[in-house]
Design a protein with these regions (language model features):
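Short alpha-helix in the alpha/beta-hydrolase fold that links the catalytic acid
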Residues: 83, 208-218
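Short beta-strand/loop motif that positions the catalytic acidic residue
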Residues: 192, 198-200, 204
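Short beta-to-alpha linker loops that shape the active-site pocket of alpha/beta-hydrolase fold enzymes
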Residues: 99-103, 180, 234
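Serine-hydrolase catalytic machinery in alpha/beta-hydrolase-like enzymes
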Residues: 7-138, 242
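Sec-dependent N-terminal signal peptides of Gram-positive bacterial secreted proteins and lipoproteins
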Residues: 1-5
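Primarily recognizes the serine-hydrolase "nucleophile elbow" in alpha/beta-hydrolase
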Residues: 130-191
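C-terminal catalytic histidine-bearing segment of alpha/beta-hydrolase fold enzymes
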Residues: 220-269
């Protein structure tokens, strides 16, 4: 079943152009010194993604947890690559999947066109993300039992859609930042068999708080471990430095909660 989002308040939360800014998400001194390797890889049919992972001077480095990172409506731009690098420095192999097949938007109108194109072929978008999971599961430096999906906005909705279609290749966790569309019915969500992290703002005009509360209720009723964090006074895309809703303090806190969630439910399990 394909869920079509309500875009009310969605465009207004974005600025006219994408912006790169991850300086607010601090790294510890030891993490700053982590060396990374990155490359473009073909992971599904004609889809290419940005792959980045930490490299060790030791030959004894074991297999690492991994993340399929799913872009916002802009596409795989420099901001997404910077976020992938940031997460890789925490010890993850990160594959930034591309649902736009190399296209990157530089204005809201083009971004909306690309979103609609991806949504109009939702089955292919899911197959694309499943291909990313399979690619990581076969990578020699990845622990195939510790693969997570993470996305923001459009990508958050796709992260959830992947969770609803991952029975063949189960995930370790699902993370969505104000994901649209937000699936809330218990029957659909009961397919998920792993922990879920949801990050939302209570002033989000695209995702009513009633939907967020129903999302949490359905997860709880289905016995799905979950952490749902709702930030007061912030709206849609508050973690996006491109937008008028950008909230640096809440973004930094949400990122720390994301890392803590990954540590608890992925790294330490």
């Amino acid at each position: 079943m394909v869920f079509i989002p309500n875009y009310s308040g969605f465009v207004e939360a974005q600025s006219s152009k994408p912006v790169t800014n991850v300086s607010n998400l601090a790294l510890s001194e030891d993490m700053k010194n982590v060396n990374l390797q990155n490359k473009t890889v073909q992971y599904f049919e004609d889809a290419q993604g940005y792959l980045v992972y930490p490299v060790s001077s030791s030959d004894s480095q074991g297999k690492l947890p991994a993340v399929v990172m799913i872009h916002e409506w802009w596409g795989v731009n420099q901001n997404i690559k910077d976020m992938a690098n940031l997460l890789a420095k925490q010890g993850f192999v990160v594959l930034a999947a591309d649902l736009y097949h190399g296209k990157v938007a530089d204005n809201p109108q083009r971004a909306m066109e690309l979103v609609q194109m991806a949504r109009n072929n939702q089955n292919n978008s899911i197959a694309n993300l499943q291909g990313a999971v399979k690619y990581l599961s076969l990578a020699p430096n990845v622990d195939s039992t510790k693969i997570t999906s993470l996305g923001w906005c459009f990508g958050g909705g796709q992260s959830l859609q992947l969770a609803l279609n991952s029975q063949e290749h189960p995930l370790a966790a699902t993370i969505l930042y104000y994901g649209t569309p937000l699936v809330t019915d218990k029957q659909s969500l009961s397919k998920i068999k792993w922990p879920v992290l949801g990050i939302f703002g209570d002033k989000d005009e695209a995702i009513p708080m009633g939907e967020v509360n129903q999302f949490r209720t359905s997860l709880n009723q289905s016995g799905i471990i979950n952490e749902i964090h709702i930030y007061n006074g912030v709206g849609h895309a508050f973690a996006n430095p491109s937008g008028d809703n950008y909230a640096p303090k809440e973004t930094a806190d949400a990122w720390q909660k994301t890392l803590s969630f990954l540590k608890k439910y992925v790294i330490e399990t």
